[in-house]
Regions:
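Acidic, proline/glycine-rich low-complexity IDRs
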Residues: 1-219
């Protein structure tokens, strides 16, 4: 697309090329599926002075039995001529999360968790890359849950590949829950992240977060 073509399209107030690009990428994995979408309150969004940096979340039903959550807000979503032709679209990634859940309401906590990660990145200006990990201060990543999953590990999404957009590269960074024991071992030796991912994939190829998991994959 040329800059002239972009300017013409941008005359439409609803033009959101970044948003459309994300949906198109997921349509490859989930053809003809209409995901459940949750938008954040306009007044709460950072662009209007609020603290919400994620504008919305979509939840897809995977044929493999899990819910697949994607954020909208870590990359450039709307018409912005200054962002046109960039190397990376804003932070260069959107966040994903996979969860075994019966209903979309069961995914609300995960969306809130991703929202907090978004706030962390925007406020601290500290982004995530595959292999990065973070503790939830030793507490379950789902508030109030009886779970050994107290930290997260970032990986490339196991199902949806990154894309090149008019604003630059957009990767899909998946977060998977890990135990306190695994987190402590990664702190001692971050290079073990690759071993952990490979071990987890043997039982869980899509790296779906299981809050009931007690097994440690690093010993």
């Amino acid at each position: 697309m040329t800059i002239e073509e972009f300017r013409e399209k941008a005359k439409d107030e609803e033009y959101a090329p970044g948003w459309d690009a994300i949906e198109d990428a997921f349509a490859v994995c989930y053809p003809e599926q209409n995901p459940n979408h949750y938008g954040t309150n306009f007044e709460a969004r950072a662009m209007f002075g609020g603290s919400e940096y994620i504008d919305g979340y979509s939840i897809y039903q995977s044929p493999h039995g899990h819910k697949h959550i994607i954020t909208f807000g870590m990359t450039e979503l709307y018409a912005d001529e200054e962002a046109f032709g960039g190397k990376y679209s804003r932070w260069g990634y959107e966040m994903t999360f996979k969860l075994k859940a019966d209903t979309t309401d069961d995914c609300m906590w995960a969306m809130n968790f991703l929202g907090n990660l978004g706030i962390y990145t925007y406020v601290k200006e500290s982004w995530f890359e595959p292999g990065h990990f973070m503790s939830n201060m030793g507490k379950p990543i789902k508030t109030g849950a009886d779970s050994m999953i107290t930290a997260i590990l970032a990986v490339d999404d196991t199902e949806v590949s990154g894309i090149d957009t008019i604003y630059g590269r957009v990767d899909f960074l998946q977060f998977v829950g890990i135990t306190s024991e695994e987190y402590e071992m990664l702190k001692e030796d971050p290079s073990k992240a690759k071993l952990l991912i490979e071990a987890m994939k043997k039982d869980n190829p899509y790296l779906v977060t299981d809050l009931g998991r007690k097994k440690s994959y690093l010993v």
